[in-house]
């Protein structure tokens, strides 16, 4: 296992741990509220920032691993776009339920869309196995379906659908699985160069 691969997996592990711990703070309903609503408490906001920062580190680690990948420039560019979306999530807080939608909240929401839409595209680009292609397509489809169902709330601040929080967390879990599988595919590709 290479250093960038270990670093990427460790960063995903930190993000998952921060995501789990942030549910212990505040009164966010994991089934019916968005993960971003944890910004209602200072510890929740800090842990959301830690999770996003860890995934930015993971993106950087994968970019190192992608240096010998087919379509390396495109893969690395998409990893940069993913990192930018994650940074937007951390820097621009969403509006809390029942409050006016701000410009920062809109930027946050576009960052959230990038955070779940980009990894499946990267997975498809580097896929060497049917397993990663399938996981990427299913995750991309789930993210698109979730995004379409959540679009009215994203654009207008309308009420979110029931179970939207649970659906979001399932899509996030699927996305992180694709990131881990993508790291493995990049590692296998980089080992051919050594």
Q: What residues fall within each predicted segment?
A:
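Membrane-proximal helix-loop-helix units in multi-pass membrane proteins
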Residues: 85-129
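N-terminal membrane topogenic signal
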Residues: 1-11
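Aromatic-anchored segments of alpha-helical transmembrane domains
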Residues: 16-20, 82-91, 141-152
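Alpha-helical transmembrane segments of multi-pass membrane proteins
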Residues: 12-30
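Membrane-interface interhelical loops and short amphipathic "cap" helices
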Residues: 28-42, 97-103, 156-164
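Interfacial helix-start motif at the membrane-water boundary
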Residues: 37-57
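Membrane-interface helix-boundary motifs at transmembrane edges
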Residues: 64-75, 128-135, 190
């Amino acid at each position: 296992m290479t250093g960038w691969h270990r670093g990427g997996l460790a960063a995903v592990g930190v993000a998952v741990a921060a995501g789990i711990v942030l549910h212990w703070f505040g009164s966010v309903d994991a089934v019916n509220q968005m993960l971003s609503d944890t910004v209602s408490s200072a510890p929740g906001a800090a842990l959301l920032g830690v999770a996003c920062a860890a995934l930015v580190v993971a993106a950087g680690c994968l970019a190192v691993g992608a240096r010998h990948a087919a379509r390396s420039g495109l893969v690395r560019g998409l990893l940069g776009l993913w990192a930018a979306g994650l940074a937007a999530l951390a820097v621009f807080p969403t509006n809390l339920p029942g409050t006016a939608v701000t410009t920062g909240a809109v930027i946050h929401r576009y960052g959230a869309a990038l955070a779940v839409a980009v990894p499946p595209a990267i997975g498809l680009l580097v896929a060497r196995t049917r397993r990663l292609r399938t996981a990427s397509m299913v995750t991309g489809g789930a993210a698109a379906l979730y995004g379409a169902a959540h679009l009215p709330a994203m654009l207008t601040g309308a009420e979110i659908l029931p179970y939207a929080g649970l659906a979001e967390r399932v899509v996030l879990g699927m996305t992180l699985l694709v990131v881990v599988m993508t790291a493995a595919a990049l590692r296998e590709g980089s080992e051919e160069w050594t």
